[in-house]
């Protein structure tokens, strides 16, 4: 994030570039492993052909064109450690349950057949970014400022995408830990000490050691599963809590409604489309032009950005994952919109004003 923050601070002083222009420069960023992963899935989808039904079953039955099977196998071998909510060691990886990946590929195949070209759109964003960078540099008041601005723009575009790499590598470690823990869980489930191999993820290491030594933690596991499932159903997640449990946002004076939801500008531009409220990316079905409305996103969600025309997110700020990816894909985005997934109805037509940080419906 440091190169982007440096660009946002220095470029306006050097060239009088505004926020919208900086957002254009930050679109179509290269060297982003997550973006490359998304575009790879898109390319695979374009080889499936017109029949895209029951893709998961056909993949598991090996009933797909050879190049598609090879592409999916290779993708899962290299990126199968990823998933939505991937920093939780208890969440199954794509390699264990490829349904989410195959659902995305199926959706890509449908939208590609409808004339939508996500790869071309990303390339167009990169080209527009280069044009904007040249325009910004040309406005520099002197040669020294111009050289520094050009250097800054080039370095940021070359380096910003690498911000995903540390987490990508960290998740490799989490996935490896999951494999080992689940192997222990499988053995314990086989002896009847636990009901399910995944029960081990509801214990800490000390408790797991006790279980291996013969302790009975089935009641503890059941209690924690109940709490976990209850928390998964929670509709509202506070962005900030005080030490006494108070949520500061509930103490703020609520302004009269003007027919719009208010949040933080994350990616400039204005777009009108059909809202798709998504809480589980594995169950999402986005058509080209749809606006993604979500509680929050992580890299496991980013394949959805290839078909979305805008983003509304309940959590996060201008430098959150969803905001950054929206800028890279050149789609308007508003983040930090309280209760967006409940106040916006799936299928409703909404307008996202990325620059103003508002959503109208």
Predicted regions and their residues:
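Contiguous hydrophobic, helix-prone segments at protein termini
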Residues: 1-265
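Short, flexible coil/turn micro-motifs enriched in small/turn-prone residues
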Residues: 23, 85, 187, 258, ...
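Glycine-centered flexibility motif
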Residues: 60, 80, 238, 263-273, ...
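Residue-level detector of functional hotspots within protein domains
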Residues: 179, 226, 256-257, 261-263, ...
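Generic, ordered loop/turn and secondary-structure boundary motif
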Residues: 195, 201-203, 209, 262, ...
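Phosphate-handling DNA/RNA-contact segment within nucleic-acid enzymes
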Residues: 248-291
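Acidic, glycine-rich flexible loop/linker segments
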Residues: 275-290, 295-361
């Amino acid at each position: 994030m440091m190169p982007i923050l440096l660009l946002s601070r220095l470029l306006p002083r050097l060239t009088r570039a505004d926020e919208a222009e900086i957002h254009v420069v930050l679109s179509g960023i290269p060297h982003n492993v997550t973006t490359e992963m998304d575009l790879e899935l898109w390319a695979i989808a374009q080889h499936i052909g017109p029949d895209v039904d029951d893709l998961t079953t056909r993949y598991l039955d090996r009933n797909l064109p050879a190049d598609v099977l090879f592409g999916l196998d290779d993708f899962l071998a290299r990126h199968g450690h990823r998933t939505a909510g991937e920093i939780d060691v208890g969440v199954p990886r794509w390699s264990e349950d490829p349904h989410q990946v195959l659902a995305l590929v199926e959706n890509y195949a449908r939208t590609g057949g409808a004339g939508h070209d996500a790869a071309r759109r990303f390339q167009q964003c990169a080209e527009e970014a280069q044009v904007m960078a040249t325009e910004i540099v040309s406005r520099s008041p002197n040669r020294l400022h111009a050289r520094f601005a050009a250097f800054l723009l080039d370095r940021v575009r070359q380096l910003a995408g690498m911000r995903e790499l540390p987490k990508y590598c960290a998740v490799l470690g989490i996935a490896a830990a999951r494999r080992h823990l689940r192997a222990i869980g499988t053995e314990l489930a086989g002896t009847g000490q636990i009901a399910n191999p995944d029960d081990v993820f509801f214990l800490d290491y000390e408790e797991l050691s006790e279980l291996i030594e013969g302790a009975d933690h089935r009641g503890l596991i059941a209690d924690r599963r109940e709490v976990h499932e209850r928390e998964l159903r929670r509709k509202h997640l506070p962005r900030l809590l005080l030490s006494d449990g108070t949520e500061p946002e509930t103490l703020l004076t609520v302004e009269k409604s003007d027919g719009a939801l208010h949040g933080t500008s994350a990616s400039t531009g204005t777009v009108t489309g059909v809202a798709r409220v998504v809480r589980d990316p594995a169950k999402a079905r986005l058509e080209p032009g749809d606006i993604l409305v979500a509680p929050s996103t992580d890299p496991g969600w980013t394949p959805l950005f290839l078909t979305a025309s805008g983003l509304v997110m309940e959590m996060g700020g201008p430098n959150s994952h969803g905001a950054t990816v929206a800028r890279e894909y050149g789609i308007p985005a508003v983040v930090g919109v309280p209760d967006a997934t409940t106040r916006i109805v799936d299928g409703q037509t909404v307008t996202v004003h990325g620059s103003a940080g508002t959503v109208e419906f």
